Amino acid sequence: MTLQQKLTQFPRLDLVGNATPLEKLSRLSDYLGREIYIKRDDVTPVALGGNKLRKLEFLAADALRQGADTLVTAGAIQSNHVRQTAAVAAKLGLHCVALLENPIGTEQANYLTNGNRLLLDLFNVDVVMCEALNDPNQQLAELATRVEAQGFRPYVVPIGGSNALGALGYVQCSLEIAAQAAGNVAFSSVVVASGSAGTHAGLAVGLQQLLPDAELIGVTVSRSADEQRPKVAQIQQALATSLGMTDPLAKITLWDSYFAPQYGMPNEEGIAAIKLLARLEGILLDPVYTGKAMAGLLDGIEQQKFCDKGPILFIHTGGAPALFAYHPQV
């Protein structure tokens, strides 16, 4: 059974539509002296785009299958995942309840009200604030219990949509990448931001099957490699099992020098990467995920950290709405 056939065993809503573009960044390539390509998952078609829509194709389908009328999820005030979950809920006629934290402890009104947070109000989300998402699975379970007691039928969408079911979205993306690359380019490396780990794990499983010679690198955005590796590996293993795969799993490669000072706080390298892509390619990165991941890619070239000098693919997971919340830092 092919990978595509295995995917068809899982209920899926078609939210993404046609394959997102895979483009060469010609001006950046000339600037760096290295072929750089980009997978434009920032332009998925719901609520200003982003990678979570791929996960929600499977998660929301499962919610509908279970008869849910409410999506319950969690994230930071400027969470791209919560924004996309809320939009999908609106599109499907579901309620959405979001448990939010303020991970950087700021009182700046722009951060607290603009960007992704502004969009949650437009999508009519029921927002619940908490001090910190220290045990998000337990906190979401407790919130779902309260929502159910109010007469709703909740479905819990994990932080980032990151579990084995959601990660199927990035197995699907791997199929797109392989089809778009076939006969055109042979990637030596693929770079992606690694946070809640579902996107990274889905690519790890999919690309192992489809582009086994490509080195997949996750640039961490919230924790050290030692802390992040088990998160990726757990979803990778569960995902492979759900797809009936028995081969040894691909090694998880993580670069963790680019997320300081902490999750959700911009740094100089990330902001420099945002400005570089905007000025050379007219493409918008964000200060939490893709800016830091691109900073890793740029430094990786400078420090010769890649396995060879072949073409590099950058997975653009979205996040540009957060730019407005981080002004004037960006």
UniProtKB/Swiss-Prot annotation:
Its EC number is 4.4.1.15. It comes from Yersinia pestis. PANTHER family: 1-AMINOCYCLOPROPANE-1-CARBOXYLATE DEAMINASE-RELATED. Gene3D superfamilies: 3.40.50.1100. It is an enzyme of class 4 (lyase). Its cofactor is pyridoxal 5'-phosphate. Belongs to the ACC deaminase/D-cysteine desulfhydrase family. It comes from the Bacteria. Homodimer. GO terms for molecular function: D-cysteine desulfhydrase activity. Catalyzes the alpha,beta-elimination reaction of D-cysteine and of several D-cysteine derivatives. It could be a defense mechanism against D-cysteine. This is D-cysteine desulfhydrase. GO terms for biological process: D-amino acid metabolic process. It catalyses: D-cysteine + H2O = hydrogen sulfide + pyruvate + NH4(+) + H(+). The gene is dcyD. HAMAP family: D_Cys_desulfhydr (MF_01045). The modification N6-(pyridoxal phosphate)lysine is found at residue 52. The keyword Secreted does not apply. Keywords: Lyase, Pyridoxal phosphate. The keyword Lyase applies.
